Structure formats: structure tokens, C-alpha cells
A protein has these predicted regions:
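Conserved acidic segment of CheY-like receiver
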Residues: 3-14, 19-23
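Conserved sequence signature across two-component system core domains
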Residues: 9-10, 35, 53, 85
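Conserved Asp/Asn-Gly motif in the active-site loop of CheY-like receiver
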Residues: 32-39
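Alpha-helical interaction/dimerization surfaces of two-component signaling modules
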Residues: 22-26, 44
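CheY-like receiver
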Residues: 42-109
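A generic structural motif
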Residues: 27-31, 77-79
Length: 109
């Protein structure tokens, strides 16, 4: 069985490490890379072409929504997006932007 390629874009180091750790416990996922801001995330997504992208909504250089709008035209593979944030106020917008799911930080197993 092929593993799902995963990428995480999040400026919160602790949240990024926690999610990476939890994903590492599941044999279905292979974490291919992480990025700490939108600019790095854009490069990571193009390089890795993840099946599943965990994307923080609020980052210092651009929002996750802005990043998604920037890459939308260049994603030619089937990539699912999980918006990952501490603020539930973004849930409706995330779904409108074609989010596969929405995960609130901090998450619990």
C-alpha cells in the first residue's frame, strides 16, 4: 500500500512538531516536509506534490487562504487540504476555499 504524502505549513513550531509526531504514528502517512511560512510552503508544495496538506490559516507573511489562492492554478494533482488553526472563525471560509477538512489547534488524539 502506498503511503499518503503529507506536507505541513505552519509558523507555530510546537504545533508543527506535535502534528508531525502524531502523523508519524500512523503508517498510512509519510511526512515529506514542513514549512514555517507561506513562501516556504509554496516551494514545498511544488517540490513534494503532497496528497494531503495541513495548512495553518494565520502566518506572518501570508494567510493560508492567500497561499491556497496563489497555488490553485498550479496544482495538477489530487491534493486534499486540511486547514489547521487555533481559530474556529475561519471554518466557513476554509470550506468555501475547498478545504477537505478543518482541524482546530491544539488538537487531541
Amino acid at each position: 500500500m502506498d503511503k499518503y504524502k503529507v506536507a505541513i505549513v505552519d509558523d507555530d513550531e510546537v504545533a508543527l512538531e506535535n502534528l508531525s509526531f502524531e502523523l508519524g504514528k500512523d503508517a498510512r502517512f509519510s511526512l515529506k516536509g514542513t514549512a514555517r511560512n507561506g513562501k516556504q510552503g509554496k516551494k514545498l508544495i511544488a517540490k513534494v506534490q503532497p496528497d494531503l496538506l495541513f495548512l495553518d490559516v494565520e502566518m506572518p507573511d501570508m494567510t493560508g487562504m492567500e497561499l491556497l489562492q496563489e497555488i490553485r492554478g498550479s496544482v495538477s494533482w489530487n491534493m486534499r487540504i486540511v486547514f489547521y488553526t487555533a481559530y474556529d472563525k475561519y471554518m466557513v471560509q476554509a470550506i468555501r476555499e475547498a478545504a477537505f477538512d478543518y482541524l482546530l489547534k491544539p488538537f487531541e488524539e
